[in-house]
């Protein structure tokens, strides 16, 4: 079966791993172009495999969108020192959600008086800048009054979400740097950890607003890949999996 040829634009490429379980490798890597067209499926996510692809297109690639996987970042910078990496917004925001989750779990495991942090986990996990009903606002206020640690962590997460609504790149960068400082100085271990993560990825996070690109479209592509694998009864040979994905997604 011949895969149809399409014109590809390599100026921006997006890297995204998925669980393919092919040829004894748990993960494979999908690569998409500027227009979200599938470029290639790599047999694994090893640095040597990614390096081979990047070096083949080093003169064309200017920006790389990716999740917050240090191995990917190190490989991209070593092959493409002049390219800009753009962190995926979804994965960045998830870091803040993990922070409040870990604070919540630590507290309700430490004392029975914090059991409501377990009961109302959905309310706590909700986007803090979304609409809350009067009863939800009242409950959230009670939850914050239970613990200064939780209240401070929740407020910092709220500020984090608010920063991503800023469109001006300079202001975004300024507010992000301030937030990182607040997180590191909070005295809350989960917040400090988040601050360190954001600091390590600060340039790539700033590039989210600078270039206004993200890997959001990849979720739909991954869902299609999952369907392909399910309908093919968990195809195990990589070459067959690759051709099938290229036919269905390209």
Task: State where each predicted segment sits.
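Amphipathic alpha-helical/coiled-coil segments positioned at domain termini
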Residues: 85, 192-194, 199-250
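RNase H-like nuclease fold core
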Residues: 1-75, 82
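Charge-dense polyanion-binding interfaces
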Residues: 111-125, 237-250
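Amphipathic alpha-helical
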Residues: 162, 166-216
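Helix-loop elements that line ligand-binding/catalytic pockets
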Residues: 117-185
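Conserved beta-strand -> loop -> alpha-helix junction used to position metal-binding or nucleic-acid-contacting
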Residues: 67-71, 77-121, 219
């Amino acid at each position: 079966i011949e895969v149809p040829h399409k014109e590809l634009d390599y100026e921006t490429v997006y890297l995204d791993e998925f669980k393919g379980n092919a040829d004894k490798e748990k993960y494979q890597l999908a690569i998409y172009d500027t227009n979200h067209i599938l470029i290639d499926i790599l047999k694994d996510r090893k640095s040597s495999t990614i390096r081979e692809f990047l070096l083949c297109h080093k003169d064309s690639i200017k920006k790389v969108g990716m999740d917050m996987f240090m191995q990917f970042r190190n490989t991209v910078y070593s092959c493409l020192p002049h390219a800009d990496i753009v962190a995926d917004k979804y994965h960045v925001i998830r870091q803040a959600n993990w922070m409040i989750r870990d604070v919540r779990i630590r507290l309700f495991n430490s004392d029975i008086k914090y059991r409501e942090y377990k009961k109302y986990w959905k309310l706590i996990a909700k986007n803090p800048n979304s609409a809350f009903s009067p009863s939800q606002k009242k409950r959230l206020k009670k939850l914050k009054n239970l613990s200064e640690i939780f209240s401070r962590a929740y407020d910092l997460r709220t500020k984090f979400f608010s920063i991503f609504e800023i469109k001006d790149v300079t202001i975004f960068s300024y507010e992000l740097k301030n937030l990182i400082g607040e997180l590191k100085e909070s005295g809350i271990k989960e917040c400090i950890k988040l601050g360190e993560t954001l600091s390590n990825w600060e340039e790539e996070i700033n590039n989210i607003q600078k270039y206004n690109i993200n890997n959001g479209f990849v979720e739909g592509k991954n869902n299609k890949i999952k369907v392909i694998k399910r309908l093919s009864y968990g195809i195990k040979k990589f070459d067959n999996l690759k051709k099938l994905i290229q036919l269905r997604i390209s």
